[in-house]
């Protein structure tokens, strides 16, 4: 379904909450037809039908795309958005306390992600911290992360996983916590501007 919106992009983040229920976070074109604005949709019947739930934040002057969301409790959610307001590229955090019905802006977890920006990936670790990974596209091109011990109200300084990228064409991570408490991160990567792009991986203790 198009939800009466234009330019829906398949840059989707989703959270399965029940056997037949899933909440999706997608991007649509803004009212001027340009990229982009994040919204939330939901299916309660295993994908037979979908309903629009809410926009995440006001329509931006720049863009708001490629969301990463996490359900904190029954009604509490957090969403991290790839944001651009020239000349800045950053990651902005929103929170909902009514099961995605409305959202309020919290903060910027990452003040700068480098040229063009990069989307985040987010999980809750077993020790309760929120863990957010992203690609940094300015030199030194790198994979970095931040953590929060207060459900996203504040964030620590960025920590570098690796910084040997060949150029800015990198990032788009996915993460999972392993049974030993380490984190497995996979991401789009390159070793040289003219080299092949590939999926890289790192395992580390956060």
Residue ranges and their predicted role:
Residues 1-206:
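Asp-box/BNR beta-propeller blade signature and adjacent active/binding-site loops
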């Amino acid at each position: 379904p198009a939800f009466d919106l234009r330019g829906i992009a398949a840059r989707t983040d989703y959270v399965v909450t029940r056997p037949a229920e899933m909440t999706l976070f997608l991007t649509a074109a803004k009212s001027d037809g340009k990229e982009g604005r994040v919204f939330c949709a939901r299916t309660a019947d295993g994908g037979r039908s979908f309903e629009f739930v809410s926009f995440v934040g006001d329509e931006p002057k720049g863009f708001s795309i490629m969301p990463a969301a996490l359900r904190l409790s029954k009604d509490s959610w957090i969403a991290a958005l790839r944001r651009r307001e020239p000349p800045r590229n950053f990651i902005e955090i929103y929170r909902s306390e009514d099961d995605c019905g409305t959202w309020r802006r919290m903060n910027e977890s990452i003040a700068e992600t480098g040229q063009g920006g990069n989307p985040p990936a987010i999980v809750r670790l077993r020790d309760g911290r929120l863990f957010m990974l992203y690609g940094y596209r300015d030199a030194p091109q790198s994979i970095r992360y931040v953590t929060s011990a207060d459900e996203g109200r504040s964030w620590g300084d960025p920590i570098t996983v690796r910084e040997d990228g060949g150029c800015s064409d990198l990032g788009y991570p996915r993460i999972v916590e392993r049974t030993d408490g380490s984190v497995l991160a996979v991401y789009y990567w390159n070793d040289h501007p003219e080299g092949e792009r590939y999926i890289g991986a790192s395992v580390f203790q956060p």
